[in-house]
């Protein structure tokens, strides 16, 4: 009887220690449903924004690193106008393109936010990864806001920090 209780207790301990993740969710939004023809939109201003992100960071020494989940958040800060994103390109630490997230321009409605998520196990970006975003907006509309949120949780420890994009053109 003691043995059965011990086995049941061990079983319940094992299943209670599993993560409560939602691994069946898509990591990146389906941008094809947001596709737009910019030729039909009148007089737009364009810009380009650089966003640094970190899929891996150093800890203690340069030989020890921690993997991070990256969320690149793209926000339309306008109360009334749509903004358009025509390029979302992910680059690694060496400045080489890793992935392009858009096949065609997409729209972001007023006050809407979309995200690109880089999974914690995806380490192609390295310690100095970045995004280049190209965007369009109406002349009197506020610029889109680009933020990176990096997070890692392991056991009872957690690490998170943010970066903000800078306009380069």
Language-model features: locations:
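Sec-dependent signal peptide recognition
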Residues: 2-8
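C-terminal motif of bacterial Sec signal peptides marking the signal peptidase cleavage site
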Residues: 13-16
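Terminal connector regions
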Residues: 22-30, 122-169
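Post-signal peptide N-terminal segment of mature Sec-exported envelope proteins
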Residues: 25-47
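Short, solvent-exposed loop/turn segments enriched in Ser/Thr/Gly
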Residues: 65-71
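Asparagine-centered strand-capping/turn motif at beta-strand->loop junctions
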Residues: 74-81
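Short, hydrophobic/aromatic beta-strand segments
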Residues: 81-88, 100, 143-147
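Intrinsically disordered, low-complexity Pro/Gly/Ser/Thr-rich segments with frequent PxxP/GP/PP motifs
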Residues: 93-130
């Amino acid at each position: 009887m003691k043995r059965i209780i011990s086995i049941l207790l061990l079983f319940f301990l094992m299943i209670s220690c599993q993560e409560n993740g939602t691994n069946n969710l898509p990591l990146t939004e389906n941008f094809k449903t947001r596709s737009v023809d910019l030729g039909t939109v009148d007089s737009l201003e364009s810009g380009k924004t650089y966003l640094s992100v970190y899929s891996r960071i150093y800890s203690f020494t340069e030989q020890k690193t921690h993997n991070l989940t990256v969320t690149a958040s793209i926000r339309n800060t306008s109360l009334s106008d749509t903004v358009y994103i025509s390029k979302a390109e992910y680059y690694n630490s060496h400045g080489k393109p890793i992935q392009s997230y858009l096949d065609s321009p997409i729209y972001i409605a007023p006050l809407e936010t979309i995200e690109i998520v880089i999974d914690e196990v995806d380490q192609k970006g390295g310690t100095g990864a970045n995004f280049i975003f190209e965007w369009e907006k109406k002349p009197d509309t506020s610029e889109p806001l680009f933020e990176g949120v990096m997070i890692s949780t392991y056991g009872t420890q957690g690490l998170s920090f943010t970066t903000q994009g800078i306009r380069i053109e």
